[in-house]
Swiss-Prot record:
Gene this protein is translated from: ileS
Positions contributing to Zn(2+) binding: C886, C889, C906, C909
Catalytic activity annotation: tRNA(Ile) + L-isoleucine + ATP = L-isoleucyl-tRNA(Ile) + AMP + diphosphate
Native species: Lactobacillus acidophilus (strain ATCC 700396 / NCK56 / N2 / NCFM)
Name this polypeptide is given: Isoleucine--tRNA ligase
Tagged with keyword Aminoacyl-tRNA synthetase: yes
Gene Ontology biological process terms, A to Z: isoleucyl-tRNA aminoacylation
Length: 927
């Protein structure tokens, strides 16, 4: 018999390489074929619920790394909750209406303006449904477990019907109204935009200081050769000027410059003088802003007057303290105009071109008017200074073109009547990170009314009729009738039926004596679509629950979905749609740049999956602090792949060395485990407790860090490091070996369960090698936290031993550097411990020689010799061990040959072989 055959060498078919791109897809098919999502929910029926409501991504193109971060994060949470006993369904959603779909059709040469509206919308629907299927395939391939057969999609008939009911409730309560006011207007997409559809970019702009001649100063200042100085960054709005706004609390200086006088805010005088170039000026008078109200100036270009008004939005941050006010082109301007009954003059059309209301500018694009105004003011002698500067300006988030403020007639949702209720609901909700609460609170506190109408084709139509005299018709009966039609036919019914067919049978109105009605042409803002999903999905679907326990999206959704959902939910039910909000940062490259094709830094999840596997992306998510921006690059993903390899190889070692272990037959009770095995069991138990607590806080970064640290330090660098001397060398059924196998097997089971939400494919593969009752690890529950009575005592003593071990490893390294030894098993170590360390060693009563992986260990209770290395907890002498290397245990021993039956082996190995392989004692051994 060969010596090798007497060793208990580990064996496993669990491969070192995961072959993830191939194996993952096989697992996903198996999960789907065996209905694992449904099986898990069935196991948890009647248990406490956990409802994560999926914020719907827009259905357009393949998924990007931001999608992957979001969906994997949700999947980790839902998988954990299900394995921890919660009934945690997950219904994925898609946002499908809106401009991007129309843009894609335009690229194909389809013109919505020349096509029947219903047919055009059908093409939009087809495109959106194709995109949903494309993204669904991508999400499934990330290993996301969900109710893929029953997703919610904002174009579904029932969803659209319920959205109409949400609108109807808000209308009934008086929150919806029609009005004319300035809104974000995208000339590039010919529609209004919500705040959430606007992004800011730095652009160069003309800023001008303009002199408005004073014509009526109420007798307070001399109007002769006196000018109000305004500053604006939008010269193109000068034709629409109706007023000059001052802050009633500020002081204003009348400044003599040559033979002219100028009025500016006292607090900005020095800055303005420097900007314009007034070298020699003198303050001749100071007046209060409050006293300037109702003064008048002459428009420098047009035959009209400009009224001086008050406004607390006027600041001393920039400009002159006198604000050019055009009620048709700005929110603050509009509010001032309402107070003073000024005209809402907005002579720019949907394409950003001036109308015939300013004849000489008719047909000119507003940006061209910008340059023209500078020239005209210069020619009129009214331009005091032109300066080109860079500032942050709103752009359409889809077309990337600048937007303008433009007063148009729109439908609005007023939040003022229930703003306090919303703020109270924000206070009641929990936010991760905690600053999210303040951010959303301030947004709601400061936000104006929500413009909910859009001048587009692809969306849910505003369910409003108009009577013959133009009166809007919206009643509970008309709303429910339309909702029921949409439930059956979808919102395209609005375009395939006449107004009469869409109204309840026999409907009449005093405003339509002839019984004629027309339909509203505008559609609802897409944020109203997704913002009503709490009702169309969580409230109305069987098996789901409202309010949701968690909303999890990117931090841009504080002004998007978190915001719109909150408004509609509180408006209709009085409560927030979520109990908790978790926001994540954006995915950037490793240099902190946004991903873009022009920079060439785009990483596609599908490409990564083909090269490395979805598990590597999932591990990247688990390793990242997602509450702030998250970096990704091929280098970073390579680091995740290295972490994966470390985890996989550790599991391979554990599986190989427990392949002959059956927990029912060979398991050792905790009280019978060796001290070092109990210590590892306690460390494992503490890890379980820490990981469950971190999962409960949705902190899977901590889960991964704790597990990786345990695998790297507690297992690989310590327990499994000295395990070979037990697992390979000791008798197959010896207490020492079975004790250690008990712990290793337990660690494999518990680590597999805890890692399943993060690495489901790999953990499912590992589960197949464990002797556990559940067919799939996803059908198993998270490990329970045990209570060990000797927990504190063992942790303290073994903690002290680990400090001593550090000393020994240091001494061994020094001996290696001095060429005294090569490997640690060549060493004979003598320890002279301090009093506390000696007491610890006596208490633990363990095989420290084995644990330290040395051939000989002597502990001396006495004074250390001169040649001892003085370290933190002991003095240590390292020498080369005397004797020969035992070919079986590889230790240097002086007792080789003492057993005449097996003269090749040391006494320990000879005894083990005689017990386990009696035939070897008779026949002898060979190398």
């Amino acid at each position: 018999m060969r010596i090798k055959d007497t060793l208990n060498l580990g064996k496993t078919k669990f491969k070192m390489r995961g072959n993830l791109p191939v194996r993952e897809a096989e697992w996903e098919k198996e999960w789907e074929d065996n209905h694992l999502y449904e099986q898990r929910l069935k196991l948890n029926e009647g248990h406490p619920r956990f409802d994560l409501h999926d914020g719907p991504p827009f259905a357009n193109g393949n998924i990007h790394m931001g999608h992957a971060l979001n969906k994997i994060s949700k999947d980790i949470i839902v998988r954990y909750k299900n394995m921890n006993g919660y009934y945690a369904p997950y219904v994925p959603g898609w946002d499908t209406h809106g401009l991007p779909v129309e843009q894609q059709l335009a690229k194909k040469g389809i013109d919505r303006k020349t096509m029947d509206r219903a047919k055009y919308r059908e093409l939009c629907r087809q495109y959106a449904e194709e995109q949903v299927q494309k993204q669904m395939t991508d999400f499934k391939r990330l290993g996301v477990m969900a109710d893929w057969d029953n997703p919610y999609i904002t174009l579904q008939h029932e969803f659209e019907g319920q959205e109409i009911r949400v609108f109807g409730e808000m209308y009934k309560k008086g929150y919806i109204y029609k009005g004319k006011k300035p809104v974000y207007w995208s000339w590039s997409s010919e529609s209004t935009l919500a705040e959430a559809e606007v992004e800011y970019k730095d652009v160069e702009a003309n800023s001008i200081f303009v002199a408005f001649p004073v014509v009526d100063s109420k007798g307070i200042i001399d109007p002769k050769d006196t000018y109000f100085v305004i500053w604006t960054t939008t010269p193109w709005t000068i034709p629409a000027n109706e007023a000059i706004c001052v802050n009633p609390k500020f002081d204003y200086s009348v400044v003599q410059v040559g033979d002219k006088k100028y009025v500016v805010a006292t607090g900005l005088l020095d800055k303005v003088a420097e900007e314009i170039g007034w070298d020699d000026y003198k303050v001749v008078q100071t007046v209060k802003g409050a006293d300037m109200e109702y003064m008048k100036a002459k428009h420098p270009l047009y035959d009209k007057e400009s009224l001086v008004t008050e406004g607390f939005h006027v600041t001393l941050d920039d400009g002159t303290g006198l604000v050019h006010t055009a009620p048709g082109f700005g929110a603050d301007d509009f509010n001032v105009g309402q107070k003073y009954d000024l005209p809402v003059f907005s002579p720019v059309d949907a394409h950003g071109r001036y109308t015939d209301e300013v004849p000489e500018l008719e047909g000119m694009f507003y940006q061209d008017v910008d340059k023209l105004m500078v020239e005209k003011l210069k020619d009129a002698g009214a331009l005091l200074k032109l300066k080109v500067f860079t500032h942050s300006y709103p752009h359409d988030w889809r077309t990337k073109k600048p937007v303008i403020f433009r007063a148009t007639t729109q439908w609005f949702a007023s939040i003022a009547p229930f703003r306090d209720q919303i703020l109270e609901q924000i206070d009641n909700a929990k936010f991760i990170p905690s600053w999210g609460k303040t951010r959303l609170y301030n947004m709601i506190k400061d936000r104006g009314d929500w413009v909910i109408s859009r001048q587009r084709a692809w969306g849910v139509p505003l369910p409003i009729f108009y009577a013959e005299d133009g009166t809007p018709i919206v009643t509970p009966e008309t709303i429910e009738h339309i909702a029921e039609i949409f439930d059956k036919e979808g919102s395209n019914a609005w375009y395939t039926h006449t107004a009469k067919e869409l109204l309840p049978e026999g409907f009449t109105s005093e405003h339509s004596p002839n019984g004629e009605f027309t339909k509203e042409k505008d559609i609802l803002d897409v944020w109203f679509d997704s913002g009503s999903s709490w009702s169309g999905v969580m409230e109305k679907r069987d098996g789901l629950h409202y309010p949701a326990d968690l909303y999890l999206e990117g931090s841009d959704q504080y002004r998007g979905w978190f915001n719109s959902s909150l408004i509609t939910s509180v408006a209709v039910t009085g409560k927030a749609p979520y109990k908790e909000v978790l926001s994540q940062g954006f995915v950037l490259d490793d240099k902190g740049h946004k991903m873009s094709k022009s920079l060439g830094n785009v990483i596609s999840p599908n490409d990564v999956i083909k090269r490395m596997g979805a598990e590597i992306i999932r591990l990247w998510v688990a390793q990242a602090d997602t509450t702030s921006d998250v970096a990704v690059s091929m280098g970073i993903l390579q680091q995740s792949a290295e972490s994966y390899r470390k985890i996989r190889n550790t599991f391979r070692y554990m599986l190989a060395n427990t392949s002959d272990f059956d927990p029912k037959e060979n398991g050792v009770a905790y009280d019978d485990l060796r001290s070092v095995d109990q210590y590892m069991e306690i460390k494992l138990n503490d890890l379980v407790a820490e990981c469950l607590a971190a999962y409960d806080k949705f902190d899977f970064t901590t889960v991964f860090k704790k597990i990786f640290n345990f695998i790297s330090n507690d297992l690989s660098a310590f327990y499994l490091d000295f395990a070979k001397d037990v697992l390979y060398i000791e008798g197959k059924n010896s207490l020492e070996r079975r004790s250690m196998q008990t712990v290793i097997y337990d660690a494999a089971v518990k680590l597999t369960k805890i890692l399943t939400p993060i690495l489901p494919h790999t953990m499912e593969e590992i589960w197949g090698f464990l002797k556990e009752p559940e067919d799939y690890v996803q059908l198993a529950n998270m490990p329970k936290v045990e209570n060990y009575t000797n927990h504190d005592e063992l942790l303290e003593n073994w903690g002290k031993f680990m400090n001593l071990r550090d000393d020994v490893l240091k001494a061994l390294e020094d001996a290696r550097n001095k060429k005294l030894i090569g490997k640690s098993f060549e060493a004979a170590v003598t320890i002279y411990p301090d009093k506390e360390t000696k007491a610890m060693l006596d208490d633990l009563d363990a095989d420290f020689r084995q644990i330290l992986i040395v051939s000989k260990l002597t502990i001396v209770d006495g004074e250390a010799p001169e040649n001892a290395e003085k370290l933190n907890n002991a003095s240590i002498v390292v020498e080369h061990a005397e004797g020969e290397v035992c070919p079986r245990c590889r230790m240097i021993r002086t007792d080789i040959g003492e057993d005449p039956k097996l003269p090749e082996l040391c006494e320990r190995c000879a005894k083990i072989v005689e017990e386990d392989f009696p035939e070897a004692a008779q026949e002898g051994l060979e190398e």
